[in-house]
Amino acid sequence: PGMSFFKYVAQDFDLMPYTSVAENIGKFLSRFYPEEKEQRTKELLEVIEMSSFANEKVKTLSGGQQQRVAIARALAKEPELILLDEPFGQIDNFKKNSLRRKLFSYLKEKNISCIVATHDGDDALSFADQMMVIKNKKVIAFDSPRNLYKSPLEHYVAALFDDVNELYVDGEKRLIYPHQIQVSKDSSHKAVVKKSFFKGSFWLIEATFNSQVVFFQNPENIVFGKEIGLYFVD
């Protein structure tokens, strides 16, 4: 704030409610170059997937749509650095993934550095070059998202990406994601099924293993009370 090379998109958006989406996006673009202003506005409307809303008043938009307009307005003058605070927090899931891909691809194309403050690991996992994890106002991890996902230092870090089991296996304490556990009839690690949750492409199974609760993914449902063997993938 206060520096032309840096833009910040807060969660309150600070938009002009009684003007159009296009006018909001082009607010800080020069009126002396109307054709360039119009072209830039159209380009950003495509990035946020709101071309059909160009003439709509901002006050008629949903919270998620207003959030997208605020991001586009911040990008209008192509800052060197942009800070996004929970940028997809109010956007529906069906739109979120598409918008994430388009926005972060655009930022890389324009060589705009971006800092994202988020509680959603998906914002970082596929798009960030580096990820900093803060807990109780202290930095507890700083590395690439890939390294933090594959070798989390503690449960808090792993839980940012997915459900995670903190288990003692053969006397060793391990952090294990549900997809890293498979059912194996030959395994000596026995567990008893307690619950199951349909997740679309798989079932999330809850079981007890050595007096510990464990969650794992399975292609099919498993009946309550069944004893199974578990194989833990390294």
Per-region residue spans from a language model:
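Non-catalytic connector elements of ABC transporters
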Residues: 173-234
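Conserved ABC ATPase "signature" C-loop
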Residues: 136-137
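A short, proline-enriched helix->beta-strand linker immediately N-terminal to the Walker B motif
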Residues: 76-80
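ABC-type ATPase nucleotide-binding domains, specifically the catalytic core motifs of the NBD
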Residues: 14-38, 47
